[in-house]
């Protein structure tokens, strides 16, 4: 520590050891003596307390956890009026501010550590936790409790303060009075900015800086509160920088970061927009359009894409700049800013810029920073647009330095800047999203590609051409008027004529083609190489299998060389798609047609030799050497083309994006491709990883995938089914069936080819991450001795900054203070018992000569792991985990910490909306609802039994101490007080007395173990405690200076902590909190007075009908409480309007951003936690930003240019998911977060692929705020707001690092529904990211290795899930097509180990060689199986290196035993569905994912309605296909599919708590029946009809207004999807899937090999040309498909008409008439479905496989037809459910439909026809799912074992059964009896409908045998049907190919299935 008093004076901060979080005795409730107690006798013994290990130098009052909080006085002089009585002398200085070293005696005393135990016994006075304040919102005593805290007059009353004055006027800061500066005797000590004091040779005093702010405010019209806020913001920055460098250097570097250096965003914009040319000669003189803009009349749609730009008159393009050689430049050019005659090169311009920056005075630098901050601080939503702020800064500064501004005498009105500059821009952005209808705002249904968003507005200012579009009403351009006039003319700019879309975020899959073109080139190209080489039959004509696959050499080379053409096609498609997304008029768009022409030319060049070989060469010529040489050349050219297109980014194809010294693409270079280069070793590692990935991937794919399809290609491409025919088609369809299968197999193999890459990426990422963990030394596999025994030395060397200590102490003394503070903090959190604490603490013990020495805990020297686990802390406890990680983390390389006084200031920012702040007593001791079986407190006690036991013991001690003062009755029971009976209330609910101070303790204990804001704040306030602890330990001399005045010592420590750390909670809804929420927030402010809350305040409108005024306000725990019981804001800054224009979170963060302080921001969610031992590392963490160097190098010097131009923008940190032990779902969610946030981030950060994920990440405040903030905020598009900060940082030149040694706690969703909601939000958010311009910039500009890292870490993960589900779908289509052949033909013998040849493969004769296809099918199953299971590798490996082999093995098998693979399958489908749905329909939004404990049983109907569309429907379709495949092509591999696909259907119910309880099951069944039937008489929120309507709205959309009224859910409007989007997902895909099911159905009914199809025995042909031959499956399929639909339309019309006739009359006497009518119609439709199923079975000859396949086809046809009807026939959905009720009631009048009354019935007619069919489907599917569960619910004690799997609770600690009243029990029993009878009745009917036909069909099929058929019909019996319907009934199943030998021997027919 330096000797200068400025570095040690004016300390602000908290004591790190002591805090209200851990001190029960120092609360706002001191008068109640709630926690003012001495330690219990059990641990107040001499060894523990009196033998404390701290010297008297810490003063009598030193108690690490005992200091007053919650009162104004404790806040220190910075926030309260100066107390003249305490001003006194400067404790730090004796003469002229110099520090006096202690005497030798003093030093000796401390060196020998000869302390008196009585001087320090308070440190171990283990008292209660300050977080357990006596507080209960539900208690009437709150008023008295609150009033116990003294609050004086408002410390923030600035009514008497002047903001206009000369230097020294002194703007009041944070409540200090104007006389603050007058106390010269105590100036340094009380200085709010200690590093910025006159003693430090300041370039500008704070009064001078203040005058700058006042002057700018007066001239530009800023708000006073905003000015004060920004002044404090600036001074905190200066104080932070000046604490580790000279003040002059601090101001200089700040100016460099904000304005002038190469890393400053403003400088980049200045040159990118050619403002240097504008300042020199004007843009009109350098080719930018000049003259006046002609008058424009707006036409067409509002801001339509086709709207033309303003026409301008262009003067002759003559540049006044002339090129000169550098040597001709005058040497004195440095002294001149710019000269029109100088060189126009970028290099010269930058040289002149640096010269000007060096020549600026510090006043000018401070003025520029102040101006930028004032503009930014009041910019509201414009803060998301950094280049707009840069432009405003340019305009404002041009005015400020003009003579006009210098002559201003009258100040501009306050709010001028907001009202005239910011508000018009805000209003434009607001109007883009909202329109006024009937006086209310309604959100526009405007897709992203028609909405001009933040980025479009911002990018207009990237280029001079965009700035030139800013015009006035008369057409004059802003840029053409003098620079000094522009700022005040900005209100006249016609903003709506300037902006246009700069990138079209069209909802299209084409984005993937452009953004990831290299992924497709790499994979498609290599797939073509492999597959073309192994598909000789496709280019060997004629091919004869008996000759084997012997293609000509030239043809094989040429076929493989087609890869280049494929690559060119992909590149051309990517370029054409880019043309769709990037408007040509945007100056930053690169020419596409030139690139496209070159691509076409390359394709033609590559195609010429291929065409020559295949088109102009015979087979004989293809074997010649010349043709082979041509083929080789074509192959070599294809490799060159393939490699080039794979390596080079799309934007850099055929030329770099920008050349040196070029001005045109500077904006693209600076803002979209300024990627930080990797260090050589990291770059090498990146390349090595991807070389390894693709080497293994290509090798494995070739040998495992490609070679396995080689034989299927040979047999299927040459296979000719013979004698097969169906009516109307003959042999046309069945003849090409093998080739159809081959095409689907090719596509499936291609998808698996993509999946393999991700598999190898996971493997190698894990391998390299593990290797790096060993390099860093963070693996637990390091010996125990190395981790724990060396921990004291590592604490001394890596936690403490001891190099600058003026007084040296023995390391043990310093270490003991840190270690004891950590242990005691865990004790206060009830993680350790007092016995554990005694074993872990350093103790003072007697030594020689009466001295005392410190005894090291045996914990550090223990050699036995078992002893450590059992002796020092509970086994597998939170304390063990935290201490283990702390020890491991210290073994890693950690930057050396700087002294506390020199560390930078930082802020923790926590956005909060409606998250739970503090649990109420009702919430923790009452069951959540009637579906829950356990209270929250009971569940927490089960999860944390040791911690609950510690808490109860602590509470009992507290009660015993307070008992004599509370009432005498307690003391009378002293003898029996500790009996088990008396202790029961403590162990039950944690308290015995209902006094607030006791109930609050229980509430806090529960809140600290749940996902609450209180847990987050209490955890991150540990930063304050850590700073105070470190400052005190490293600077023991300050204790001596204060003597025994502990209060002044505490205030000094508080000042230091407050100076270095701020915690801001952005409580958006604070002003509208409920009473309970407000009381909880007030409790937080009283418990943590330094906590700051930013919120939206509101003033009612001055006039009726006007909008209220909104303000961004800031309060803290020291703010005055006003008469309305609200706190007076410290700052209250008016806003342009409601800042929440997006999805909320990012707007909330942006609103509070001006209130952060310091250089760095840590973004935290409201469900996180932090720990004292982690907070002790904060100095090293901040040092990772690499800005701790204090060398005085001028950032504008030439030498500084060579330094790193890419600062660290984001520092990622580890997360510990503290919800991992909650059960299987919590563990799975935690595992994913741990692996993705830790294991992969470790490698990704090193190879440049990591982005920002919010949670614990630290951000470089200046870098991020000058580049758009900490997130993006366009609604829908930026729903995953935080990752855009990472992409923005990467694009703009920032580096993103990862910190291994620091971690925060994080909560995760715990219930099945909430986890899937989170996955849906992430999946839809990823869909939106695919559309974003950030993905376009990254995908088309990153170098290959970093692009691959980015792709596979982010979009690749989600696309991989999509590919997995697509491969499953394709597999099922292949399976049913293959099964259709297998079922009716004879399959040849096949030996997979033998080479396929004609002689060995066609056995028996006439057979079909399908063995290779079946072998390929098995390989596919194995591939998908491996891909699924590979997801467990990272978690297992992570657990292995973090916690050891045993725990990794245990966790793996616990997950497997708890069916987590089924959950993974379901999650994969949800991800896939989310991204595909979003790209088709949109609708991405923030989904609130509940953070409570999922202990309640959800009804079957809710789960079904929630997951039917994402998963259950597709699972049911797959199951039907799989059932058919199992009956026809059975292999053992299909078992895997049965398990996986069943997971898609049953996973929601399998992971539903208590799903299999017998009584609950049937009560739930009743609810399902009611769910199906309700909602037809009156609207019901939870009904089948409501679910059905909601499902189709994603296609139809909602009517935006009904009867002229605004939408009732403005923010939740679902826009109608575009037809082009829906066509692909809802028309084309269902049509293809329908074809995939129809074609095999036709083949299975084509009777292949039937000799009756031979028309001419003398000249038999395998091909049947007669289209009237065979049965008629086409008509059969049409009948069984259309009858239910026709019946639906018929009943819809009949019942609709009957309702109109009977409804009005019957409705008078029977209110349930509509429901009854609907139930009758639905029941009839159910019976129609049953009849159709039985008829289909009959028509298919009682063949169950054919019937199942028929229903696969029918289901696909119905899906396709209903999609078409919905898309073409249904208009928008009415929000209210009145149309449905009107249909069934017949009451269309009086409903207020207006003219819709004529169209709604027609629409509803179509709806009801569709709904009747969908109802029957849901009825059968729901019952089938319930029937599947019957065997499970019959298992004894199944509910108990099921709960063990879900919650991981032992059977002995199971959640109790629910308790019902007698009446409820009777009712439940009656329900169970009735509905179990209904359930089993329907089950019996289902079984009868299946078993009876199955048995009857078996009898019927025993009729005619094959031999009888031969005897009956000789050859020539042609089965020709004369009538259409004669072939509708399919004959019984007969394998005619089995009789091939008979026909061959008897009639000498020979039909081969192969060529």
UniProtKB/Swiss-Prot annotation:
Transmembrane segments: 519-539, 557-577, 596-616, 628-648, 687-707, 750-770, 1362-1382, 1421-1441, 1507-1527, 1531-1551, 1624-1644, 1677-1697, 1713-1733, 1748-1768, 1815-1835, 1877-1897
Top-level EC class: transferase
Biological process terms in GO annotation: (1->3)-beta-D-glucan biosynthetic process; fungal-type cell wall (1->3)-beta-D-glucan biosynthetic process; fungal-type cell wall polysaccharide biosynthetic process; secondary cell septum biogenesis
EC number from the UniProt entry: 2.4.1.34
Polar residues biased stretches: 1-10
Reactions accelerated catalytically: [(1->3)-beta-D-glucosyl](n) + UDP-alpha-D-glucose = [(1->3)-beta-D-glucosyl](n+1) + UDP + H(+)
Gene ablation phenotype (knockout): Cells lyse at the division site and at sites of polarized growth.
UniProt feature, compositional bias: Basic residues: 308-327
Residue positions, PTM Phosphotyrosine: 965
Post-translational modification Phosphothreonine, affected residues: 976
Subcellular localization, as worded in the UniProt entry: Cell membrane; Cell septum; Spore wall
Entry GO terms, CC: 1,3-beta-D-glucan synthase complex; cell cortex of growing cell tip; cell division site; cell tip; cleavage furrow; cytoplasm; division septum; Golgi apparatus
Residue numbers carrying Phosphoserine: 969, 971
Main location (coarse class): membrane
Topology relative to the membrane: Multi-pass membrane protein
Molecular-function annotations in GO: 1,3-beta-D-glucan synthase activity; branched 1,3-beta-D-glucan synthase activity
Subunit structure: Component of the 1,3-beta-glucan synthase (GS) complex, composed of at least the alternate catalytic subunits bgs1, bgs2, bgs3, and bgs4, and a regulatory subunit chr4.
Sequence similarity: Belongs to the glycosyltransferase 48 family.
Function: Alternate catalytic subunit of the 1,3-beta-glucan synthase (GS) complex. Synthesizes 1,3-beta-glucan, a major structural component of the yeast cell wall. Required for maintaining cell integrity during cytokinesis and polarized growth.
Extra remark: May synthesize a form of 1,3-beta-glucan not stained by Calcofluor White.
UniProt protein name: 1,3-beta-glucan synthase component bgs4
